[in-house]
Amino acid sequence: VLGLFTLGNALIHFIISIVVYKKELADKNIFYFISGLVLVFITIAIPVQLDGNWVTMFWALQAALLFWIGRTKKVLVYEYLSYPLMVLAFISIIQDWNSANNFYSPEFANNTILPIFNIHFLTSIIFVGAFAFINYVKRSPNYSQPEKLNKDIAQIFSFLIPAVLIGVTYYAFFNEIQVYWNQIYI
């Protein structure tokens, strides 16, 4: 119920943002602010309404979408909104891996998964795809870094995005191989 209320709130803000945009009732910054609120309410509704891996997938995809909009349309607020979502998605995937490793432990020997075709690996691959897309857009000469972007934040994320991408890619395959062999020998 709470998730539906939050989505309803996002829908109301979405309708208002469309009216503001179509009728040109306010400055573009107001439109971007209201649209940002829509995204914030959707971001809040995701963990309230969904569980585990779905939250990670939606947050990673939403971060990629916001980063792409922010960089290609030169709307700095969307790029700034993407950075906390990247952090949330990273924390969420670590929690997903932790719960997956606990689920497939020797105490639960009857629990088996199909290698590669399981929700945990799918989540990891979607996360890697989203971060690869973010990294591509960030490094693309077609989409230059906005002038007003905080240089410290830009420098930190210029290092973190590829590092997270490499680390998650490695651990996704490592975890999949480990779970497979644990199922056979434990």
Regions found by a protein language model. Name each.
Residues 1-186:
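Alpha-helical transmembrane segments of multi-pass membrane proteins
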